[in-house]
């Protein structure tokens, strides 16, 4: 069969883009060679509807072992009693939890998208906001942090069946203990989406939500540095609180409802090649070197945030506790949108993403800010001594976002700098 040169040429172009640039998108990372090998393996050929030992297809003996290893490793990593590693993405994992916990029209709470939440936490254009009744909570305008007193007041008023914590653009630690107290007070379940800080949590550098939440979801490809995918965890299994029963009249465990919500609820056959790659990544995360890597991720982020503030940029909440930060452009460049900033920086081979900031007057297509993070550049071996220089390069571009000569000059410096770093150094 003839090799598809069109696609493989594009793959090489993407490889070169990744090698030459400074990758600052907070949700992106670079995986190891062995994770990619597992993902591109013959495991992709196997259909395996169901779960290990309970499949609807024959010949699943090997993929059963691979999936069970992934389950065992992720449980060990977070101290969980139960895990499902089949969700194709974090959004699919969240969709499955909502399907298991809510009926159509039920009320739940999540962080508003404009304040750093995620589409799957109740956005009206997402199934979570179409099928159910979302109530959004906000950040404090003064501090840029979650206002737990306001969250509690809203929970008492709206009586949600489920409260969701976690977000896609929130740089601070979450108070899981307080959130569990709020959930218990109103009789709600607590779900934490730890997709962004999952790697830092696995390394013990941030609080583990598995100790407090009824259910925890995550992606596997951000700070956890695995293939693109999702997981669902529970610290401890429990009887479902709605009295749903098995055909034999026994109260169903929450794990049974969640398993059924993933398959056949929102998915068919699992991606066993991706699950194999997840298992490899989870094994890497159990190695002591992973904590060293995550420590550097956090250190780089703290220094990067301070460098932005030293240059006169507003960092929402005044800093970061994790790998990410949200930059509000309005105080320094009132007329500059996140869209224009992103385009100019990408042209200089510095990749960021435009992002709404709390109480933003601009739309999600324009925005008044952008989001940055350090997982990917840290994987390449970049240390904190380069953070000030990176902000200097960004500032030069944003000070003249339409000046092609400035952009070309910065791009040359970026390419020269990144030529010293491999794609995967840890």
From Swiss-Prot:
It is found in: Cytoplasm. Its EC number is 2.1.2.1. The keyword Cytoplasm applies. The keyword Cytoplasm applies. This is Serine hydroxymethyltransferase. It comes from Porphyromonas gingivalis (strain ATCC BAA-308 / W83). Pathway: One-carbon metabolism; tetrahydrofolate interconversion; Amino-acid biosynthesis; glycine biosynthesis; glycine from L-serine: step 1/1. GO terms for molecular function: glycine hydroxymethyltransferase activity; pyridoxal phosphate binding. Belongs to the SHMT family. It catalyses: (6R)-5,10-methylene-5,6,7,8-tetrahydrofolate + glycine + H2O = (6S)-5,6,7,8-tetrahydrofolate + L-serine. SUPFAM superfamilies: PLP-dependent transferases.
